[in-house]
Amino acid sequence: MLDQDTVKILADLSLTMFNKNFFGIYHGAISTKQDEYSFMINTRDAIFDRMDEKSFCSLNINKQDYRWNIASMESDIHATIYANIHEAKYIAFGMPIYTTAYTLNHNKIVLEDFFGKTTFGEISIYN
């Protein structure tokens, strides 16, 4: 059984990220570590602006079972991060929907924090 408070937190965060164009309808993944051996992640058919308990599943970090078939396609990546970075509690993977269009008219992508105060680096765009 999934913790309802955790589902609410992830659903609210998912809606915010969806509204800011970090998640598309079916693009992205969001998860939280439940304990040392398990984590909760969205299902592969989750709609990020309408998440509820049915939009998530609980997975074992070390062992794949039938639940991995309905989980997000990024589940392996999340499991690896949780297994190797023990302090990790939440992971969100998103790709802004206009990134590809942006690359058509620009030579680089500048990575900034949410408030735009810190620059994390640049990615050159090659044709």
Where are these regions (language model features)?
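Glycine-rich flexible loops
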Residues: 1-127
